[in-house]
From Swiss-Prot:
Belongs to the ATG13 family. Fungi subfamily. Pfam families: ATG13 (PF10033). The keyword Nucleotide-binding does not apply. This is Autophagy-related protein 13. Residues 423-437 have a biased composition (Low complexity). Residues 239-288, 305-354, 406-458, 530-581 are annotated as: Disordered. Activates the ATG1 kinase in a nutritional condition dependent manner through the TOR pathway, leading to autophagy. Also involved in cytoplasm to vacuole transport (Cvt) and more specifically in Cvt vesicle formation. Seems to play a role in the switching machinery regulating the conversion between the Cvt pathway and autophagy. Finally, ATG13 is also required for glycogen storage during stationary phase. Residues 559-571 have a biased composition (Pro residues). The keyword Transmembrane does not apply. Residues 438-458 have a biased composition (Polar residues). GO terms for biological process: mitophagy; piecemeal microautophagy of the nucleus; protein localization to phagophore assembly site; protein transport.
Amino acid sequence: MEKPKQKLTQVTVNFFLKTSQMILQARSLDEHGKGKLNKWFNLHTFNSDDLRSELRLWRSTIDLTAVPPMIVETYLDLGNLPQGHTLALKDEHGNLWPVTKGGSKKTEVVLERWLVEFDPNEFGTIEELPYIYKQAIILCRSIYTIIRIMPAASLRNQSPHYVLANKIVDGSKPISSKGRIGLSKTIIPHQMLTDTHVRHRTFSPIETSLGTLKVSVAYRSHCEFTELAEWDHRELGREKEPREDLRQVESKGEEDHSIESIPYEEKAYKTDEEKSDKTPEHVQYKPFKPEFKQLEAVKLEGSDFKSELHEGTSPLSLSGSPSSPPRDDKKRPSIQPFRVGSIGNSPPPASSSLERRISITSNKSTSNASLAAVLRNPRSSFSIPIAGSIGTGAPVTGGFPRSVSSSHGYGYEDSDSAANTPRFSSSFGSRASRRFSNTSVRHGSLHDTTSPLGTSAGSATSIPLSGLYIDDDISDFVRMIDSKQDLRFGHDSGGSGSQSGSQYEVLNRFHQLKSQHQQLGDSVNASVMMHRKSSSPPGSYESHVPSIHSRLRESSEPHPAPATAPAPGPLIKPASKMMSSPVISTTSAHAMSQTASATTRDEIVGLATTPSTYRKHLHYENVFDDDDEDEDHHGYFKAKARSKSLSRSHFDDDDDLLFTMSDTNLAKH
C-alpha cells in the first residue's frame, strides 16, 4: 500500500517540475538549452542548473499533504530601460497608455501568474496509476500549447531594454508588490476597457485517491508594450494645450494627421499597498479627415437641416472636425410640398377619355371653372400675391385648405403645424363607414378667408358639418388635370424671375374668372338659406352622395320656393349599385332634374345640414361600389325604374344641389 503512494507522490512532484520548466523555457530560458533531458509525460525539456535551487522545495517533497503550492510569475523587467524613456501600453483601439519611465522605482510589470497546487481535501476514487499518468500527459500538452498563444508570448526578445523574466515563489506565503506593478493593478482605465484587464483560465483537474492536482493561470489581456524615447520633452508638451493643437489641425485641413499624446503622472504608479484610485488621463487626436457632404438636389427654403458625418472615436479622445464651409446661396429648385399625389409632378396620361366629376354645393352652370381654379391653386407658390384682384386694390394671397379629407374625415392636420401645405388624404378603410360620411365633421380650415377664387371651399370654417369630399383615387384626377395643356404650369429651368413671372401670369389669368362666376362667390360669402325641391319629378333621379353644404341666395334659385309649412315629400330610392367616380363621388343623372317639371313642391326650413329638419332618419346608400362605368349606367337607371313605385314612402335626404364637372366643362373655361 505504501508503494503505490510513493509512486503517486513521484508523479505529482515531477508534474510540478515539468510545469515550471515548460513555462520558463517558453518565456525566459532557451528552449534548446543545455542540461539533462527530462522525458517525463512524453515531453522533452531540459533540467536547467539555474532552476535547481528554486525548485529545491518541491524536489524534496515526501508527503503530498505538505507540498506547498507553486507560483510561477512572468514579468517584464524594466531594469535596462534608459533614463527619459517611457514604457507605454497599447489598448485594442490603438491608444497608448503610460506604464512607467526609465529610472523610476517601478522596474517590474507582472504579466502572468501560474498556480500549480495539490489539494488533499479533494480526492477521488481512482487508484490506478497508469490512468493518472495518462491524464497528466494530456494536461502537460494542454499547458504547452496554451502558453505559446497567450498575450505575453509576443514579448519574447522584443527589445533589449525590457525583457521577459520568471520567478518561482512559494504560494503559501504572501507576495510583495514593492517595486513593481502587480497583476491587480490596471494600466488602462476601467472605463476604456471593453473587457477586464486580467483574465483567468483553469485547466481540468486530475483526481487521485490522495488528492486533486490543479493548474490555473491569471494573465493580462493587453501586453502590447511600446518604448517611447524622450517622451517627457517631446510628447508631454502636447498635453498642456490640446485644444490649441486641435484648432491648428482643423485650420490646416490636412487629410492624414495623427497626434497621439500620453500624459504622465507620477502619482499613478503607487504600490498596491497604497491602493491608489487615480488613473492617468488620456488625450488623443484622431486622424483628421475632411468632412464629406452629399450634394442635395432639392432643399426647402428656410431649412436649417445640415447633414454631418461622425467618425467613431474612443470615449476619452478629443477629436475635432472642421466646420463645414457655408453653403452657396444659389436658387434651389422649388418642390411641391404634397405628401401624396403631387399635382405638379404627375405625368400627363396617355388619354383623357375617362370622365371625372366632382360634387360641390354650388350653381351648376357657374362653378366649374372656379372649382378647377381651386384645384390648380396648390400647384403654385402659396405666398405669391395676386395683384389686380376683383373688388379690391390690395394684393390678395392665395389660400387653400390645409387638409382635403376623404369620406372618412382622416387626414386632419393642426393649423399650427410648421408647413402650410395641403395634402390629399386617402381613405382605405371600411366601405361601410363611408355611407355615413356626409354627416361627419370636417376640420379643414382656410387660413386666408379672402380667397380670390371664390369657391365653396371658403366656407369650410363658417358652416358646420361642411367639408370637401374627395374619393380615394386622387392620382386619376390629377392626371386628368395635367392632361389639359391650358391648366399646366410651365416648369422652366431658367432664372427665378421668369419662373415667378410665369406663375404670376397664370394665377392672375385664373383669378380673372371670378368676374364670370361672381354669383357663386357671393353665394358662399352671403351664406343664405338654401331652398330646394321637396319632391322629384317623375323623370328625375337623385343619388345619395356626399356633398359640401353651403347656403345660396334665394335669387340664385331657378324656381322660387313658396312660403309653405315644411312637409315630407316622396323620394325615389336609388338602386343599391350606384356610379362612383374614381376621384370624386358624383351622379350622372342630376342634369335631368334641372329641366324636369315638378308637380309638388314643399319647403324645408333651416340648413340642409341640420338633422332636425328631417322627420325620419336619413337613408344612405353605398355609393363606393367600383363597377364598370357602362354597366353602372344601365343598372342604375333600370333599378331606378323598378324602385319608382316603392320610393314614395321615403323622405328627403340632405343632398344639396349637385353639378357635374367633366372634361368638356373644363375645356370651355
